[in-house]
Amino acid sequence: MEKFTIYTGTTVPLMNDNIDTDQILPKQFLKLIDKKGFGKYLMYSWRYKDNKYTEDPDFVFNRPEYRKATILITGDNFGAGSSREHAAWALADYGFKVVIAGSFGDIHYNNELNNGMLPIVQPIEVRRKLEQLKPTDEVTVDLEQQKIISPVGEFTFEIDGEWKHKLLNGLDDIGITMQYEDLITEYEKHRPSYWQ
């Protein structure tokens, strides 16, 4: 996993509440098992007319000025619903690095973190300010300082210390285990032969 320390990008507002994992990535695309390639299916039912890959020009992701946005500003209860990790894969593959919401579905929140993204909880007052940013306005997210720095103000956010450590150091669960490789190897040397 890549380290996440300070990230600067532009935002796209999608302020709907209760965007569930089936809206983020519909069930018909869950057959794939590689993390890559899901971005084209992100918000499929909203991005495309008649579900035929004809872009709906009214959907915010399809507007030219928002196509390169990497920070999503959204509503409450983002990622509720089924526990499909594919939804986080789709967000990451599309290019999102940060999702700022009023709240998250618990499993989806962890799935975003496990995939190197930073989900941030902010109250509606902050999200309404961020929603007003121009498509070219840059926002910096400083994980170490736990700050969002934008043209409309600076805002602090909370994150669990263990997740913060993992992101700052680019560690997933396997990476953390590998930090103890020497100790594990030494322990295995002293195990009874019937366990080896």
Curated annotation (Swiss-Prot):
One Pfam family hit: Aconitase_C
EC number(s) given by UniProt: 4.2.1.33
Keyword set includes Acyltransferase: no
Pathway connected to this protein: Amino-acid biosynthesis; L-leucine biosynthesis; L-leucine from 3-methyl-2-oxobutanoate: step 2/4
Reactions this protein catalyses: (2R,3S)-3-isopropylmalate = (2S)-2-isopropylmalate
Listed SUPFAM superfamilies: LeuD/IlvD-like (SSF52016)
Keyword Protein transport among UniProt keywords: no
GO molecular function, one term: 3-isopropylmalate dehydratase activity
A single cellular component GO annotation: 3-isopropylmalate dehydratase complex
Record key words, sorted: Amino-acid biosynthesis, Branched-chain amino acid biosynthesis, Leucine biosynthesis, Lyase
GO biological process: L-leucine biosynthetic process
Functional note: Catalyzes the isomerization between 2-isopropylmalate and 3-isopropylmalate, via the formation of 2-isopropylmaleate.
Family named by the database record: Belongs to the LeuD family. LeuD type 1 subfamily.
Matching PANTHER family: 3-ISOPROPYLMALATE DEHYDRATASE SMALL SUBUNIT, 3-ISOPROPYLMALATE DEHYDRATASE SMALL SUBUNIT 2-RELATED-RELATED
Oligomeric and partner information: Heterodimer of LeuC and LeuD.
NCBIfam families: leuD (TIGR00171), PRK01641.1 (NF002458)
Protein name per the record: 3-isopropylmalate dehydratase small subunit
Organism: Streptococcus thermophilus (strain ATCC BAA-250 / LMG 18311)
